[in-house]
Amino acid sequence: MPSPSPSSSARGDAPLPERPEALTSYQRWLFFFLSVATFFEGYDLFALAQILPNLRADMGLDPVYAGMLVSFASVGNVLAYFVVDRADRWGRKRVLTITIVGYTIFSLLTAFSTNVWTFALCQLVARIFLLGEYAVAMVYAAEEYPAARRGMVIGVIQACASLGAIVCAIVVPFLLQTPWGWRSVYLVGTVPLVIIAIARRNLRETERFSREAGDEASRDRSFGRILRTPYRARVFQLAAIWALTLFCTQNAVTFWKEFAI
């Protein structure tokens, strides 16, 4: 009888990979909640690019001033850091709720803008909350799910933001035909308020934040703390990748409908 080859023995002795831990009912609910909230984040963030030609015509803007408007609103993407920073002090639950309610309210106010100045201001503040929601949703996903499931959860939530942008591009041509025109695109953004009213009671603080809330060693939550950790190089590498990616793609995405269609 032939003896087993070393390779077959090695394969036989190798432990089978463990199945990922099943998600709890709360984790499944949280997965759905974060996905829906981030879907509307993607929808609202992409709305300006979709309505820009109509907005220019309605408010009498030339392409140069339209570009300045987009740049001004995009400053909110940077200012979102100061909202996300509060999550380390006030808690993830409180800040996530604030960001969702914030971007909903300012998207609604955008629909009632009377001139380009009020539109620009509403969009700047809305983007602070939009990017804040996205960042805190990622924190929730990182802290509330086991390592074996974390990549899948984060990937699906991020995909929902892209799906929101795709849906925005699909429905905008129809919404522009309504009596409200481009304003109706932002009126749709009030839907998250209904979600918050129904679902907020089930949202919990993350276990990690609750555990570390009274820990003296974890109270240094300043930005400078990153410079004193082993991960500082990785943080700046990822920041550079994101900055270069957006630098290359943002203009193309924002002005695609203006010049390519």
Language-model-derived ranges and their functions:
Residues 70-85, 138:
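Central cavity-lining transmembrane alpha-helices of secondary-active solute carriers
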Residues 111-122, 178-180:
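Helix-loop junctions at membrane interfaces in 12-TM secondary transporters
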Residues 121-159:
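Cytoplasmic helix-loop-helix junction between adjacent transmembrane helices
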Residues 78-117:
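Conserved MFS/SLC helix-loop-helix module at the cytosolic interface between two early adjacent transmembrane helices
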Residues 29-63, 249-257:
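Extracytoplasmic
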Residues 150, 157-201:
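Helix-loop-helix hairpin linking two adjacent transmembrane segments in secondary transporters
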